[in-house]
Each structure stands twice: as structure tokens, then as C-alpha cells.
């Protein structure tokens, strides 16, 4: 009997877990993967920018660094860049109780070039116009700076340039498991033989997201689910 489900949604949001655990199968806790994260936005920011993309940017966390884009939501952040960095963000939340995503809002400029550009006289320009003209920062990117930085930093050229290149964005939690594209956790490989059959339940095979592994992207997820499903099916 082959068994393959969406780990978070299959059989009523992971209800298969206690069914197998009761039979002695070792299962790692299911965790959201390729998921969004909660951020404590101000009401003004959330109402104005929810649904807007932030691009191009570079995100970094725990030594990992990647360029891409993401979307602002009413409750936080989601999108390709966030999904790619979801594992280290989740791990930081689990081990440290907090996590910070650092953003480079001007990936096309070095810190030195950005500092020089922002040091040019503003004249009668507002801060918003100065950021737009000298740094290419406007819209939601400018909104993020105002949301996350104290006024003193916004008005100090060197500090502002450094913040644009390394803006700290605290995240408070993963989105719920049933919103995640995929999951980490699942049936431990030690519970399976080389044919993906449960050692304690002969004739029962596991595949797909039921297995304890984590896909870096949706594409890898589908490929591995198809591959493990086929491998298990060959022994049924």
C-alpha cells in the first residue's frame, strides 16, 4: 500500500501523523517550509503597501544571501525570496526566539557609491525626492525605510546609506502550516527500508512530502514527490 500525501493538508492537515505514530513510526514534527512570515507592521504601512512587490532586493539571513523579490502582506511578507530563505528564518525563530531578515534595497550600487550619491546637496528637494533621484528608492522601498528606521537615521546620510544596504526586518513567526507551500519534517528515513517501505508496517510505502526532507523550491518539491512516488510504486 503506497501512501503519499501533502504533508500539511493530506488527510485533514497532517492527521495521518498520529495514525502512523501510534504504530511506532518515528515522525519528525511537521513545520512550514516555503512559507511566509509575520511582521508587526504599523496600520498605516499595512494599509498602504499590502499586496505590493518589493524588487529588486537582496535578502540575507544566517550567512545565506540571495537576490529576488517578495510581496508585502497585511500580516507580513511572502514570495519567492522569502520562500528561498524560509529555512534559516524558521530555524532562527526556533533556536533564538527571534529572526531578522536583512535587505539590500539598492543591489545595483555599492555602499560607497550610494553614500556619495546621497551626500549630494538636497537643495529644496524633500527626503522622498532625494531618495528617488539619488538612490532610486521610492514607493514601498521608501515606505520600508520609514517603517523600520528612526528619524535620526533617515536624516544622517552615512547611516541612511548603510541602512539601505543592510536594512533589518524583524519577523515574528512563520505563517500557519496550512498556508505553507511545503513542509519540513515527516517520516524519518530510518523508519524506511531502501524501497521506501515502513520497516514496522510491511507492505506500506511512504513517498512525497510524508518523508522527512525539505524542498528548497516548489519545483524541487514536485520533482522529488514524483520521483519518490515512482520509486515506491515499483515495489507495490
Where are these regions (language model features)?
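Glycine-rich loop(s) and the adjacent beta-strand/alpha-helix scaffold that form part
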Residues: 1-43
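Acidic, Ser/Thr/Pro-rich intrinsically disordered regulatory segments
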Residues: 38-69
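Residue-level recognition of phosphate/Mg2+-coordinating polar/acidic sites
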Residues: 3, 58-204, 216-218
Amino acid at each position: 500500500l503506497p501512501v503519499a500525501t501533502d504533508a500539511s493538508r493530506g488527510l485533514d492537515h497532517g492527521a495521518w501523523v498520529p495514525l502512523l505514530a501510534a504504530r511506532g513510526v518515528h515522525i519528525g514534527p511537521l513545520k512550514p517550509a516555503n512559507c511566509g512570515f509575520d511582521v508587526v507592521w504599523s496600520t498605516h504601512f499595512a494599509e498602504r503597501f499590502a499586496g505590493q512587490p518589493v524588487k529588486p532586493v537582496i535578502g540575507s539571513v544566517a550567512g545565506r544571501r540571495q537576490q529576488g523579490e517578495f510581496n508585502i502582506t497585511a500580516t507580513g511578507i511572502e514570495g519567492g525570496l522569502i520562500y528561498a530563505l524560509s529555512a534559516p528564518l524558521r530555524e532562527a525563530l526556533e533556536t533564538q526566539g527571534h529572526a531578522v531578515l536583512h535587505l539590500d534595497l539598492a543591489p545595483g550600487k555599492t555602499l560607497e557609491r550610494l553614500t556619495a550619491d546621497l551626500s549630494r546637496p538636497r537643495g529644496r528637494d524633500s527626503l522622498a525626492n532625494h531618495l528617488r533621484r539619488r538612490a532610486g528608492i521610492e514607493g514601498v522601498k521608501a515606505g520600508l525605510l520609514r517603517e523600520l528606521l528612526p528619524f535620526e537615521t533617515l536624516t544622517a546620510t552615512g547611516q541612511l546609506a548603510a541602512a539601505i544596504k543592510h536594512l533589518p526586518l524583524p519577523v515574528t513567526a512563520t505563517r500557519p502550516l496550512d498556508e505553507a507551500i511545503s513542509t519540513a519534517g515527516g517520516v524519518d528515513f530510518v523508519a524506511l527500508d531502501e524501497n521506501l517501505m515502513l520497516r514496522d508496517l510491511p507492505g506500506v510505502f511512504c513517498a512525497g512530502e510524508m518523508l522527512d526532507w525539505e524542498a528548497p523550491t516548489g519545483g524541487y518539491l514536485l520533482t522529488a514527490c514524483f520521483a519518490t512516488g515512482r520509486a515506491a510504486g515499483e515495489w507495490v
